[in-house]
A protein has these predicted regions:
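A structural signal for short, hydrophobic/glycine-enriched beta-strand patches
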Residues: 20-416
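Bacterial Sec-dependent N-terminal signal peptides
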Residues: 1-20
Length: 416
């Protein structure tokens, strides 16, 4: 009787957690396959490639296979017909009509219990990566996830092949001058590489997907995959420690330290970054939290080889004597908005209590900015990935992570 009661209680708790997180599960592991850049930017497409039954289903559809053949033929024709660099990548992008046709075909193919249904329910929903679209209608979620991935492919091709402006041109722009003759040669060679790497029976989206990944690589913009899988490598010691942490002994789950990039290419860690680490270390040693999350990517200046999170971790351990198992790196964020978003993702994936606050420790100026950052989040992310708590001092600010943070950002391929 007791055993039956405990099983029922477990099921109820799981159901409550499932509803609370819009279907996302903290135990879910991202199925990255052999390419984290692909999985983090275009998760539905990555899953379709990995799931043999789902791939078979969409390959057998005449409408979808027809689009794939047309895209591959357009790619091959562009190598003969295109006389300027911009013409070549344009052939690989999806048109609005193609996106709609794929949407219609996916909706028609979806059936309860089939491969697409299983993919949505066992991967898309528990991953939380498309939770902005809800989980009540799996068929609609599949279509919206496709539309987001198609937009993301077109965006990456537009910025890193056609030279269109990214959201932050000073740090995220294309690496090449589209006005120079060498640009045409480079684009031709990219298209030739994509054609050689895409077989005749490819899935309908693979020419565009291979192109986007190729353009990101030649621009040295594969930051999204750096240090992955973090939970089993650079953050393993901390992740292992989280499982046995007595959370009731601390007022906060962790301390978040946003990075501050230097203003030159030779300085690993800025003075501001050092000061933020010192302030965070004081709070750690005062027993405020069992972990410090240092957040920041390879951001400032343009094309820097130094990573903010990595350099802060080194400083905390070597200079401030924190145990390595207490420092978690979040090495991808490129803005303050994504410092908080990515931190929330790690807190969820690593199993920290989501109903307990974290503590931001930074300088007065940045905390002033964070206090009014919700509008910036809505503009750039379409959601706010946190809820603020009390401002304890000029340098300390409470916050609660929100599950919305798991949503992929389709127009930031270096940190989606």
């Amino acid at each position: 009787m007791l055993k039956r009661f405990l099983i029922l209680l477990f099921i109820v708790k799981c159901s409550i957690a499932n509803a609370q997180f819009n279907g996302a599960l903290p135990t879910y592991k991202i199925q990255a396959g052999d390419n984290w850049v692909k999985a983090k930017n275009y998760y539905l497409l990555a899953l379709l490639q990995q799931d043999k039954q789902a791939a078979k289903l969409i390959s057998a559809d005449e409408g979808l296979s027809g689009i794939g053949k047309n895209k591959l033929q357009a790619l091959k024709s562009s190598l003969v017909d295109c006389k300027d660099g911009l013409c070549l990548p344009a052939a690989l992008k999806f048109t609005d009509d193609e996106i709609k046709l794929v949407s219609d075909r996916l909706a028609a193919l979806y059936r309860p219990g089939n491969a697409l249904d299983r993919l949505v329910k066992t991967n898309l929903i528990p991953s939380g990566t498309y939770n902005f679209f809800g989980s009540d209608d799996p068929s609609a979620l599949l279509v919206k996830a496709w539309q987001q991935d198609a937009f993301a492919l077109n965006f990456a091709i537009g910025v890193y092949a056609e030279g269109k402006k990214p959201n932050y041109p000073l740090i995220d722009s294309i690496s090449f001058d589209v006005r120079k003759k060498a640009y045409y040669t480079l684009m031709y060679d990219c298209s030739a590489e994509v054609a050689a790497n895409t077989h005749n029976n490819a899935l309908f989206f693979e020419p565009a997907l291979n192109a986007a990944l190729t353009y990101l690589e030649i621009n040295e913009r594969v930051d999204a995959g750096n240090f992955e899988p973090m939970a089993t490598t650079v953050n393993k010691a901390a992740v292992d420690k989280i499982a046995g942490t007595k959370w009731g002994s601390f007022p906060y789950t962790h301390i978040l330290v946003p990075g501050a990039g230097p203003d030159n290419l030779t300085t690993p860690l800025s003075g501001e970054g050092m000061l933020r680490c010192k302030a965070a270390a004081r709070q750690y040693f005062a027993g405020k939290a069992p972990f410090i999350v240092v957040s920041g990517g390879n951001v400032h200046p343009y094309k820097t080889k130094f990573n903010e999170a990595v350099e802060m971790r080194k400083y905390l351990i070597a200079k401030l004597r924190l145990p390595a198992s207490a420092v978690i790196i979040e090495p991808h964020a490129r803005h303050t908005t994504t410092n908080l978003r990515n931190d929330a993702r790690l807190a969820f994936r690593y199993g920290m209590p989501f109903n307990k606050p974290g503590l931001i420790v930074t300088d007065k100026s940045q905390n002033d900015f964070i206090m009014n950052m919700d509008k910036r989040c809505l503009k750039e992310l379409n959601y706010v990935p946190y809820k603020l708590g009390k401002r304890l001092s000029e340098t300390e600010l409470e916050f609660f992570p929100l599950i919305s943070a798991l949503q992929i950002d389709a127009d930031e391929p270096m940190d989606p």
